[in-house]
């Protein structure tokens, strides 16, 4: 039985391609306080992904719905459109 060593190493291009394909989220929260008094708070969320990956995620969680149209004034827009003809 022989043992084979794997010498496959990922190139930088392969690593970047995988990150853009799968996406990565870095969520950081830091708070600095002195004697119970909050001096500084930092909240950061960094998302690294391709546009295609983000759009697939946004569609899955419902971030792409147009709430402005649903909450708008549909009666007012219909009144304006009634006087116009093309």
Swiss-Prot record:
It comes from the Bacteria. This is Gas vesicle protein A1. It is found in: Gas vesicle shell. The gas vesicle shell is 2 nm thick and consists of a single layer of this protein. It forms helical ribs nearly perpendicular to the long axis of the vesicle. Signal peptide: none annotated. One of its GO terms (cellular component) is gas vesicle shell. Keywords: Gas vesicle. HAMAP family: Gas_vesicle_A. GO terms for molecular function: structural molecule activity. It comes from Priestia megaterium. Belongs to the gas vesicle GvpA family. NCBIfam families: PRK09371.1 (NF006874). Its main location: other. Disruption phenotype: Not essential for gas vesicle formation in E.coli. Gas vesicles are hollow, gas filled proteinaceous nanostructures found in some microorganisms. During planktonic growth they allow positioning of the organism at a favorable depth for light or nutrient acquisition. GvpA forms the protein shell. It is not clear if the 2 type A proteins in this organism are functionally redundant. It holds the Pfam family Gas_vesicle.
């Amino acid at each position: 039985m022989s043992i084979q060593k794997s010498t496959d190493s990922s190139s930088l291009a392969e690593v970047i391609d995988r990150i853009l394909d799968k996406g990565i989220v870095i969520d950081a929260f830091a708070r600095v306080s002195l004697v119970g008094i909050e001096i500084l708070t930092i909240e950061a969320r960094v998302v690294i992904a391709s546009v295609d990956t983000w759009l697939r995620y946004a569609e899955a969680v419902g971030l792409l719905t147009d709430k402005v149209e649903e909450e708008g004034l549909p009666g007012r827009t219909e009144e304006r459109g009634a006087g116009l003809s093309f």
